[in-house]
Amino acid sequence: MHLYLIRHAHALDGDNDAARPLSPKGRKQVRKLAGLLRHTKAFETGEIWHSPLRRAHETAGMLAKGLKAGARLKEVAGLTPDDAVDRIAARLGDLRRPVAVVGHEPHLSALASLLVAGHAAPPRFKMKKCSALRLDRADGGWAVRWHVSPELV
């Protein structure tokens, strides 16, 4: 099973954190990431989960469109920056198909650390805006397959 953890792209500043849209820079980041993943065939999923925050929803939507893979978007509770990672980790452990999760820091780093190292703190990963991390599950555990940061795209 493959799991893709993707941090939302760069967003505009604003007073209402939940409503902050992607910036032009962020939109460019997502287009480039989607292009790389499509070109290298490094991404396979039918579903992209995202937090209820606008910047994550927009990142997920642009990613799905750019990948041209027909992935469905699904807003999922438990993916905001301050949410505990145990519930979402348990939910991911029950999955039998690849899924992508578009979320936020420090949540994604804590989630990746919990899945790979068995504990969320201190985080073992740093997810920059519009970075992607692929984890593969085998033999009851998770392992890092690859990581793409915005500087590489």
Segments predicted by a language model, with ranges:
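Mid-chain, well-packed structural core segment of small domains
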Residues: 75-110
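Hydrophobic/basic alpha-helical segments enriched in Actinobacteria
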Residues: 43, 47, 67-70, 88, ...
